[in-house]
């Protein structure tokens, strides 16, 4: 029952969304009370001045210093980066020049070594050719001597064989001078 009565009483009274009844309402909300406007404006001005003083004396100089330091750091870094970039370009150019010089030296050294090896090879080839020519001449001389010796032996063998053949057919030994002359005429 008490609950029904409370519901009935609350239905009779109109409440706002804040749960405060309209009827029998007390004083108005202080910021909306016109009698409080002057002190509120004074406190607003005092708060604004204190906030302004705090910002201008402490916060803004500190932010300005930070911004100034940051700008100086950026300028310094940019200057340093520019200098390093220039140094890098110089180093790259020097490296390219060094590589080109090394290539030129390597090519010159290779050509020099090639010419030196070619000269040594030609000298060895001429020496071998001269040695072979000398050996060939000596071999030809030996062949000529051997041929002459063989021919003299052949002549002697031919004389003996011819003499034996003539003696076999005729029964007498042939004259050595006539036999030699006949063999020379046939050769």
Curated annotation (Swiss-Prot):
Q: Is Cytoplasm included in the keywords of this UniProt record?
A: no
Superkingdom to which the source organism belongs: Bacteria
- Cellular component, GO, one term: plasma membrane
Subcellular compartments: Cell inner membrane
Q: Where is this region: Disordered?
A: 1-31
Care to name a GO molecular-function term for this sequence?
A: proton-transporting ATPase activity, rotational mechanism
Short name of any one Pfam family annotated for the protein: ATP-synt_B
Stretches with biased composition (Basic and acidic residues): 1-12
Task: Name the UniProt key words of this record, in alphabetical order.
Answer: ATP synthesis, Cell inner membrane, Cell membrane, CF(0), Hydrogen ion transport, Ion transport, Membrane, Transmembrane, Transmembrane helix, Transport
Keyword Glycosyltransferase listed:
no
Subunit-level organization = F-type ATPases have 2 components, F(1) - the catalytic core - and F(0) - the membrane proton channel. F(1) has five subunits: alpha(3), beta(3), gamma(1), delta(1), epsilon(1). F(0) has three main subunits: a(1), b(2) and c(10-14). The alpha and beta chains form an alternating ring which encloses part of the gamma chain. F(1) is attached to F(0) by a central stalk formed by the gamma and epsilon chains, while a peripheral stalk is formed by the delta and b chains.
HAMAP family, A to Z: ATP_synth_b_bprime
Family according to the record: Belongs to the ATPase B chain family.
Q: What is this protein called?
A: ATP synthase subunit b 2
Origin organism of this chain? Beijerinckia indica subsp. indica (strain ATCC 9039 / DSM 1715 / NCIMB 8712)
């Amino acid at each position: 029952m008490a609950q029904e009565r409370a519901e009935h009483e609350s239905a009779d009274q109109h409440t706002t969304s804040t749960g405060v009844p309209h009827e029998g309402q007390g004083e108005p909300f202080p910021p909306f009370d016109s009698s409080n406007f002057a002190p509120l404006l004074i406190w607003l001005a005092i708060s604004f001045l204190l906030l302004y003083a705090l910002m201008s004396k402490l916060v803004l100089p500190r932010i300005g210093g930070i911004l100034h330091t940051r700008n100086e750091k950026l300028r310094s870094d940019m200057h340093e980066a520019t200098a390093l970039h220039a140094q890098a370009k110089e180093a790259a150019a020097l490296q390219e020049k060094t590589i080109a010089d090394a290539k030129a030296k390597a090519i010159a050294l290779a050509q020099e070594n090639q010419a030196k090896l070619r000269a040594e090879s030609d000298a060895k080839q001429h020496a071998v050719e001269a040695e072979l020519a000398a050996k060939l001449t000596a071999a030809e001389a030996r062949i000529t001597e051997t041929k002459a010796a063989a021919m003299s032996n052949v002549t002697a063998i031919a004389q003996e064989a011819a003499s034996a053949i003539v003696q076999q057919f005729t029964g007498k030994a042939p004259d050595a001078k006539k036999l030699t002359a006949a063999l020379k005429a046939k050769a």
